[in-house]
Swiss-Prot record:
Organism for this UniProt entry: Shigella boydii serotype 18 (strain CDC 3083-94 / BS512)
Gene, per the UniProt record: nadE
InterPro entries (UniProt xref): NAD/GMP_synthase, NAD_synthase, NH(3)-dep_NAD(+)_synth, Rossmann-like_a/b/a_fold
EC number: 6.3.1.5
UniProt binding sites for ATP: G46, I47, S48, G49, G50, Q51, D52, S53, T160, K189, T211
Name recorded for this polypeptide: NH(3)-dependent NAD(+) synthetase
Length: 275
C-alpha cells in the first residue's frame, strides 16, 4: 500500500460523494450522539464566515431542529459563537453565514482583550511572543471561550476539521483542533463546497479564498500560500488521483511532520514518532 493509499484510508476519504447522502450522514451522526448522551443540551461552534464553519453550523442547526421536532425536547439548542479579534475584516461574511445558518442563539466574544492580557503576562515573565505564536494564542483563546460556553450550557464543542485540513495538520493544537465532535471529518474541501451548494448556501461564503487569518504581520494570508499547495492539489491527492511529484512530496511531508497533531498526547506505548 502506498503512502497515499494509507493516508486516504486513515482519513476516510472517498473519490466521489453524493452531497445529499453526506448531509444526511453528518446530521444523523450528530443526532445519534445527542440521543446517546441525553445530558448534552447544546452544540457549540465558532462561526468565522468561512466555508468550514458555515457548513458545520448549518449541519448542527439541522440536527437540533430535527431532534426537537422528533422528541419534543425544547431544551436542545445550537449556539453559534462569533469570536472576533478586535474588528474582523470579513465581518459581513460572518453575518451572511449567521443569516444562512439561522442558529438558535448567537453569542459574541471578542478575544482581543484576553489575548493581549495573556501576551502581557508572558512578557512580564520574559517571554516575548512571535507573531506566529500569537496567532496560535488567538486560536486557543477562541477554543477556551467555546468550552466555557459549552460548560455553562451542558454542551459539546463542534469542530470543523475535514480531510483536506487534517492531512496537512493545518490547525492549532489545542486551538481549533481541540474539539469534541467533528461532523465534517472525511470530506475534502471541494466536497464541502458540494454540500453547501446542495444546501443553497450563498456562493461567496464557499468560493472565497480560505484563510486562518491568525497572523498580524500577514493578515488574511491564504491557506494555500501558507501550505505551498492548493486545495485542488490536496483534494486530488485525497481522491486517489495522480498529482505532480513535488505536490505529493509537499503534502506527504505535511502529513508526516504533523502526525502528533492527529493523535492524543504521546505516551511510552507510542512508537509512530520513531519511524
Amino acid at each position: 500500500m502506498t503512502l497515499q493509499q494509507q493516508i486516504i484510508k486513515a482519513l476516510g476519504s472517498k473519490p466521489q460523494i453524493n452531497a445529499e447522502e453526506e448531509i444526511r450522514r453528518s446530521v444523523d451522526f450528530l443526532k445519534s450522539y445527542l440521543q446517546t448522551y441525553p445530558f448534552i443540551k447544546s452544540l457549540v461552534l465558532g462561526i468565522s464566515g468561512g466555508q468550514d464553519s458555515t457548513l458545520a453550523g448549518k449541519l448542527c442547526q439541522m440536527a437540533i431542529n430535527e431532534l426537537r421536532q422528533e422528541t419534543g425536547n425544547e431544551s436542545l439548542q445550537f449556539i453559534a459563537v462569533r469570536l472576533p479579534y478586535g474588528v474582523q475584516a470579513d465581518e459581513q461574511d460572518c453575518q451572511d453565514a449567521i443569516a444562512f445558518i439561522q442558529p438558535d442563539r448567537v453569542l459574541t466574544v471578542n478575544i482581543k482583550g484576553a489575548v493581549l492580557a495573556s501576551e502581557q503576562a508572558l512578557r512580564e515573565a520574559d517571554i516575548e511572543l512571535s507573531d506566529f505564536v500569537r496567532g496560535n494564542e488567538k486560536a486557543r483563546e477562541r477554543m477556551k471561550a467555546q468550552y466555557s460556553i459549552a460548560g455553562m450550557t451542558s454542551g459539546v464543542v463542534v469542530g470543523t476539521d475535514h480531510a483536506a485540513e487534517a492531512i496537512t495538520g493545518f490547525f492549532t493544537k489545542y486551538g481549533d483542533g481541540g474539539t469534541d465532535i467533528n461532523p465534517l471529518y472525511r470530506l475534502n474541501k471541494r466536497q464541502g463546497k458540494q454540500l453547501l451548494a446542495a444546501l443553497a448556501c450563498p456562493e461567496h461564503l464557499y468560493k472565497k479564498a480560505p484563510t486562518a487569518d491568525l497572523e498580524d504581520d500577514r493578515p488574511s494570508l491564504p491557506d494555500e500560500v501558507a501550505l505551498g499547495v492548493t486545495y485542488d492539489n490536496i483534494d486530488d491527492y485525497l481522491e486517489g488521483k495522480n498529482v505532480p511529484q513535488q505536490v505529493a512530496r509537499t503534502i506527504e511531508n505535511w502529513y508526516l511532520k504533523t502526525e502528533h497533531k492527529r493523535r492524543p498526547p504521546i505516551t511510552v506505548f507510542d512508537d509512530f514518532w520513531k519511524k
